[in-house]
A protein has these predicted regions:
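Contiguous, well-ordered alpha-helical segments that form the cores/surfaces of helical PPI scaffolds
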Residues: 98-111, 129
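Conserved catalytic cores of very large enzyme subunits
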Residues: 1-94, 115-137
Length: 138
């Protein structure tokens, strides 16, 4: 989330994304409040759900034949995309990414502290650090 040093450059892995799934953070926060549950426990629940959906998507897509996208999977459009038409595309998917997105970060701050993210971003940074650490564990 933060550069390791001044020479730290972003690295973009993969040439395709199997599908981003977005967390609506203020809805999760509000659900935690109304059900008297811990916000982070509920956030873990949704992060695990997203992880399982991504794994299922990888499994499902991996069974597809290269013929579904000849340019990508048989003619080199994707990295490793030199398969035969009847080959499964599973080996190519290891270069694809799966995204954990988020939305409503400012609204989350407003619910938590009554202040916008510009006034006080400490909770936003805390939540994003938590999400980042969890995704790193996956």
């Amino acid at each position: 989330m933060y550069p390791a040093n001044e020479e730290d450059k972003p690295v973009f892995v993969g040439r395709s994304n199997i599908g981003p799934i977005t967390l609506h953070l203020c809805l999760i926060y509000q659900e935690a409040k109304t059900t008297n549950k811990d916000f982070y426990e509920l956030l873990d629940y949704y992060l695990e759900m997203i992880r399982s959906l991504h794994l299922r998507t990888y499994e499902y897509l991996g069974q597809m034949k290269a013929s579904v996208n000849p340019i990508g999977f048989t003619q080199g459009g994707f990295y490793g995309g030199n398969l035969d038409y009847n080959d499964k595309i599973e080996p190519i998917l290891k270069h694809s990414t799966a995204s954990f997105g988020y939305t409503a970060l400012n609204e989350l701050c407003l619910l938590h502290s009554g202040k916008s993210i510009r006034e006080d971003n400490s909770f936003a940074v805390e939540v994003l650090t938590y999400i980042n650490n969890k995704v790193e564990q996956f």
